[in-house]
Regions:
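Signature of Gram-negative outer-membrane beta-barrel scaffolds
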Residues: 9, 47-353
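Short loop/turn motifs that connect adjacent beta-strands in outer-membrane beta-barrel proteins
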Residues: 29-44, 60, 82-85, 352-356, ...
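Transmembrane beta-strands of outer-membrane beta-barrel proteins
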Residues: 41-49, 220-226, 357-361, 420-426, ...
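Transmembrane beta-strands of outer-membrane beta-barrel pores
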Residues: 51-55, 217-219, 228-232, 354, ...
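Membrane-embedded beta-barrel scaffold of Gram-negative outer-membrane proteins
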Residues: 351, 358-370, 374, 383-449
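C-terminal beta-signal and adjacent terminal beta-strands/loops
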Residues: 367, 537-588, 602-606, 612-707
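Gram-negative outer-membrane beta-barrel transporters
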Residues: 419-577
Length: 707
């Protein structure tokens, strides 16, 4: 449950991000020529350009594991005896004593970089072993007999620290020792240099340019725009996500074992070919085009299991260009193809009643770049992928996700002084090419999981709002009221980028169902604001006093003062209930009860208050006064305990149900002190953050305005 006192924290990391950007924007108004004496409406043009390059570096080291690694690397080249050169023992009379000794056999090809570097260091320093003998090339070196300061990361090479994919170090933009790597190392710098294995920084380039025109045609107001976005991940990616090594295509496979091969008519020349044996193929079992699989007859199949089950060893067998290849080369990679998106924006409105009633429509397309965690594919992830069956890796080919917004609305201004308003709108948003987990089943040499632009979502909303200003005597009062309501439904195939993890773990890797989208599926949201605000000073034209509040003892007590109350309530978001509890900290998945996101959190309620009071002080020698604004801001005045999250088995924020479950009772009975374990477990439950909303908070401050 808890880390023991004195636990060693041995992980160390650092990171660095550089961002270089260029932004330019210009505006101009174009007045068309007068036609037949009629002046045509002007065009307000806006154009812009944006360039950005990020350079991200990171380095992490698991120092504790280095002690284990040193023990594995030291002395392994002298682990055998030199039996071809025995040393016979004789007594003083030259009689053989029946004792044969051997020196250690030095196998130089097995000597690790660490052993060579550390041994040379000890030899140069004249150090001795545990028996007091000077250390030489045949000495057994006990690393535990030396002090920590005798060692250093620089004694290892990159291959040893990366440890065939189970690394003690991770890095990009730095070398294996944590030194900054400038520029962009080539793939060959990693593949062909095991001592350094250089990995470049993540250096994506983003370019955008846009043009917008706003003009009026009769009583219609238009705002038309077009934005071009170019995203270049600036990295190498897998040439074929289903194989680290090049696969022959149907167009390349004409014969096999001296016999002609006739491919089905629906099989294209660029389809990948799969056979019955990796090393000695005798027949074609199927084909693949992208993610679509076909059997030998050309019939489309749902998955590639049928091919793997019919091979000689039960594993997928692509018809490799080089059947003996077991390490990735440049042929298995390609450069990222920059993605260009054209994003139109259309907005127009027309008055149903000039100055009072307006109808508007908008259409907008937006793009969002993938985050670096899902899209930055380091070369070491691919190089060691063959050793990591079922691993999750980044996808260097991720594209931007696209969101398309549609909105139609109606606005009306009314009241004697036009200080009342109403707005109603309906919206629909569609998210395409969203990011989600995807399993590459029967990839070669391993099945693995990555990210794809595969998820889809829709958000449907209705909004209504009204406001009333200057409520009071002659529509010049201090009170302003605002009320807004939103109804929103959000459904999609993934609530977040990792929402498919449970299905992948349950052997349903690429099943997509439409479910509510977590925080976006708000359903109901009501927000109201009431503000009392009094002005001060005199009207610069009429010279009348602008203060309309109460006067007490001849003082304008509420001059430059305001009181605001903001109330907000919304229905709780969805969560997924489960059929059994899971112990805190346990890596275990519980069975879903009902359907995903089939239950909802309670409603949320908050009431905030903001009080401000302004003062104006004259300053000697200054024309403008010193303005002082004092404020008190109180959030969640009623200290409402809003539930933000619950445990999926109980639906409660303070009890996960484990202690009272049969499994929990067994765990309690196995403890040395059952009561102590129970108490500590409850303390841990009560220590979880994020289960409740923020309590009442009071902030006070002063702002000074020096004009």
């Amino acid at each position: 449950l808890w880390s023991a006192p004195g636990s060693v924290t041995a992980n160390w990391s650092k990171s660095q991000t550089e961002r270089y950007a260029l932004f330019a924007m210009g505006q101009m108004q174009v007045k068309p020529k007068t036609v037949a004496g009629r002046e045509r409406a002007p065009h307000d043009l806006q154009a812009g350009f944006f360039y950005e390059q990020q350079i991200s570096r990171a380095y992490g080291l698991g120092a504790n594991g280095l002690w284990i690694l040193m023990g594995q690397l030291m002395n392994k080249h002298i682990s055998e005896l030199d039996r071809e050169n025995p040393i016979l023992s004789y007594d003083g009379n030259g009689v053989f004593t029946d004792t044969v000794r051997y020196n250690r056999l030095i196998n130089w090809s097995e000597q690790s970089h660490f052993d060579r570097a550390f041994r040379n260091k000890l030899i140069n320093e004249g150090r001795t072993d545990v028996y007091g003998k000077l250390i030489d090339e045949r000495s057994f070196v006990d690393i535990n007999s030396f002090k920590p300061e005798d060692f250093g990361v620089k004694l290892f090479n990159a291959d040893e620290l990366l440890n065939n994919g189970n690394g003690y170090v991770s890095y990009y933009g730095y070398d294996h020792l944590g030194r900054v790597v400038r520029g962009k190392p080539s793939i060959e710098d990693f593949l062909n240099n095991p001592d350094e294995r250089k990995i470049g920084a993540f250096q994506p380039v983003y370019i955008a340019a846009w043009l917008q025109d706003q003009f009026q045609f009769k009583d219609l107001v238009f705002r038309l725009g077009l934005r071009m976005e170019r995203y270049d991940a600036n990295q190498v990616v897998m040439a074929d996500p289903y194989s680290l090594y090049p696969i022959k295509t149907a167009g390349e496979v004409k014969t096999m074992n001296g016999l002609d091969i006739n491919h089905p008519s629906n099989i294209g020349n660029d389809f990948k070919v799969y056979v019955n044996d990796l090393k000695s193929p005798t027949k074609v079992l199927g084909y693949r085009n992208g993610d679509k699989w076909y059997n030998a007859d050309g019939s489309e199949q749902r998955n590639p299991e049928f091919i793997a089950n019919n091979t000689t060893n039960g594993r997928i067998a692509p018809f490799l260009v080089d059947p003996n290849q077991d390490e990735i080369t440049r042929d298995g990679l390609k450069d990222f193809t920059p993605a260009i998106n054209l994003l139109p924006r259309i907005w127009f409105s027309f008055p149903l009643e000039p100055g009072k009633k307006t109808f508007y429509v908008s259409y907008d397309v937006l793009a969002q770049r993938p985050n670096s965690g899902a899209s930055f594919l380091t070369i070491d992830e691919l190089f060691y992928l063959k050793n990591r069956q079922g691993a999750t890796i980044s996808n260097g080919e991720l594209q931007s996700r696209i969101k398309t917004d549609y909105e139609v609305g109606y606005k009306q201004i009314f009241g004697r002084t036009r200080n009342r308003g109403l707005e109603i709108s309906a919206s629909y948003s569609e998210i395409r090419k969203d990011f989600g987990l995807y399993q590459i089943s029967q990839g070669y040499p391993v099945t693995y999981t990555t990210y794809r632009n595969i998820d889809f979502a829709t958000i449907t909303g209705f909004r209504a709002g009204m406001f009333m200003e200057n409520i009071g005597r002659n529509d010049r009062g201090p009170l302003t009221l605002q009320l807004n309501y939103m109804l929103q439904f959000a459904d999609g195939t993934g609530s977040n980028i990792s929402s498919q993890a449970a299905l992948i773990a349950s052997n349903q890797p690429n099943l997509r169902n439409v479910i509510p989208l977590g925080e976006l599926d708000i359903r109901h949201n009501i927000k109201g604001t009431a503000t009392w605000a009094w002005r001060g000073g005199k009207d610069p034209v009429t010279k009348k006093n602008l203060y309309t509040g109460p006067i007490i003892g001849g003082k304008e007590v509420f001059k430059f003062a305001s009181f605001s109350f903001i109330g907000n309530t919304y229905s709780g978001g969805p969560y997924t209930p489960t059929t059994q509890p899971v112990q805190i900290g346990a890596v275990q998945r519980a069975q879903i009860k009902g359907v995903p996101f089939g239950a909802r959190l309670p409603w949320q309620y908050t009431l905030d208050m903001n009080i401000t009071k302004g003062f104006s002080l004259r300053r000697e020698g200054k024309q403008n006064p010193l303005l002082i604004n004092v404020f008190v801001w109180v959030t969640n005045i009623l200290n409402t305990k809003n539930v933000n999250s619950v445990y999926p088995y109980t639906g409660q924020p303070m009890d996960d149900g484990f202690l009272t479950s049969p499994a929990g009772q067994l765990v309690i009975q196995s403890q040395i002190d059952a009561q102590s374990y129970t108490d500590l477990y409850r303390v841990l439950l009560n220590s979880q953050t994020g289960m409740f909303g923020a309590p009442r908070q009071i902030r006070a401050g002063v702002r000074f305005n020096f004009n």
